A protein has these predicted regions:
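Conserved short S/T/G-enriched processing/targeting/catalytic segments and their helical context
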Residues: 1-97, 124-156, 172-182
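Short, conserved aromatic-histidine micro-motifs
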Residues: 155-170
Length: 184
């Protein structure tokens, strides 16, 4: 359970996350560092905390190649698959290799990409996106802000979306953490 929220205004990319770690019967507010920088990108991981730790500390850095963000992400995903295999966090289901119960939100070159557990890359058309159990609440808050709020720094919008998710999703909790990067 979590909320990972990204927003860009075309100048700055901000990625934020809550601090809840949830088990079957327990919610722990901790320092999980669900969002971090990796090379040229911003990365947020929902699902198992161990997967996020492995990607953050042992994963290949995400580098932006001359061929653009999607080919760069494909190379990074392949490097992650090779590196994460020995860690035991990949599984095969119906002949498809999966990242066990996790998804990622990646910011690269001013764009957001969701990478699901089957390594599929989806690029939303909006300048914002969210993943985790608080996804729908955060997306609703971001949509409402985009349509009526005066321009605000992306961090203010991400913070408001995280507060909305924490208010209405029992698996999302403050404090929130943020990483940001200028758009190249």
């Amino acid at each position: 359970m979590t909320a990972i929220v990204g927003y860009t205004d075309g100048h700055t990319m901000v990625l934020g996350a809550d601090s809840a770690a949830v088990t079957d019967r327990l919610l722990i507010v901790c320092e999980p560092h669900k969002v971090f920088t990796s090379g040229a990108g911003l990365v947020g991981v929902s699902g198992g905390l161990r997967i996020g730790q492995l990607i953050r500390f042992q994963g290949a850095p995400l580098e932006l190649g001359d061929d653009g963000p999607v080919p760069s992400l494909l190379r990074w995903i392949q490097a992650l698959r090779v590196g994460l295999g020995p860690a035991g966090v990949l599984r095969t289901k119906d002949g498809i290799e999966e990242l066990a119960d996790s998804r990622m939100l990646v910011g690269l070159a001013g764009r957001w990409f969701e990478i699901d557990s089957e390594w599929q890359i989806v690029e939303p058309a909006s300048p914002y996106w969210a993943i985790g159990s608080g996804q729908l609440i955060a997306l609703g808050a971001l949509h409402a802000m985009a349509s009526w709020m005066a321009p605000r720094h992306p961090r203010a919008k991400v913070t408001a979306a995280l507060h909305a998710a924490a208010m209405y999703d029992p698996g999302v909790r403050a404090p929130f953490e943020f990483v940001e990067r200028p758009v190249p």
